[in-house]
Amino acid sequence: VTDPYKTLHPFSLTYFDDTNRDYLSSELFVKNYPEYHYNSYVFCSSRGGGINTYQWLEYLPEGSTQFLFQAWGETITGIDQKISYIDEYRYPLDNVLMLIDIPLSFSRPQLPTLAMSIKNPRFSHQPRWVFQMVLLYDFIQKPSEWMRAVRKWRRSTPPTVTFDPISNDWEKGNKELDLSSPPEKDNMRSLSGKARTVFLRDYVDNPYVALPESKSVIDGSMTRVLNHIKGVFERHGTNYRIIVTPAYGYKYPSITEDDLRILQAVFGEENVYDFSGRKDITLDYKNFSDPNHFGLNIGWQMLEEIFHDGESMNGQQSY
């Protein structure tokens, strides 16, 4: 109750929730690695909740162990820090899915939302006192966080774990989903009645809404970060795929041609998959649980398109 961000006391799966997803994801990795020896990773923001890593496992070499590195508002800099940590400790980095959100992945967090996106000092090498001061500032500004922690504590008898304690998948039961066909569509059903009404009113039923303008967001400094990631991949012989994620097309822009060319120049055109401009996905509101988050049916479709008709990540022809 006195630790709403789960950063003061030693890490434990007890009352594990989504208060600070970056910190909890990375600490779960540190705690689990000696037992599970991960070698395959998904790096993503909250949009990664639409990816089921147990389905991805079907395309990985036998014996692979996968982990979802997820952070709210994840940036390419945050992904680079996690990849650098794995490289520093000489852990295997055999297979990677790197999800890129436009424009979020190339943004710089601002103070009002910094508590949700601030990086684990174990990975960022930032002084821990700075990390805790940011959380304290946020706590003072938002007393609702304390009340939220109290409510979660009262409901957690016995203690519950929201996320899969091994893979860190969005839901603990993700591995038990039927993977033989896409989940049922209409992810909007998960929205509350008011939120759904507002979304339908502002976007779906609005005849005057226009597609947002796409703007280039990858500058020289971000390109250097991308090249550093590629260098780590080359040292490890990593088999990787870069996925530009979809969002609801009448709210979020697709990637520009210039930015897409930069990604392709760094990682290879054959390794970059752009779903942000796929109107068959992005203009169907039922594919999203809200304008920013695609559903499991779309994650299923993306993995199928990337691997089913091409090569799996072990270099063998997929079925």
Spans of features found by a protein language model:
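Short loop/turn segments at strand-loop or loop-helix junctions that form parts
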Residues: 44, 98-103, 244-247, 275-278
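Membrane-embedded segments
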Residues: 36-134
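A contiguous, surface-oriented mixed alpha/beta subdomain in the mid-to-C-terminal portion of proteins
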Residues: 238-242
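C-terminal regions of proteins
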Residues: 253-319
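Acidic-and-aromatic substrate-binding clefts and catalytic sites of carbohydrate-active enzymes
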Residues: 73-77, 216-222, 248-255
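N-terminal secretory targeting modules
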Residues: 1-37, 89, 319
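Alpha-helical scaffolding within the catalytic cores
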Residues: 81-82, 223-229, 256-261
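Secreted/periplasmic serine-hydrolase-like ester/acetyl group-modifying domain
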Residues: 100, 113-228, 232-236, 319
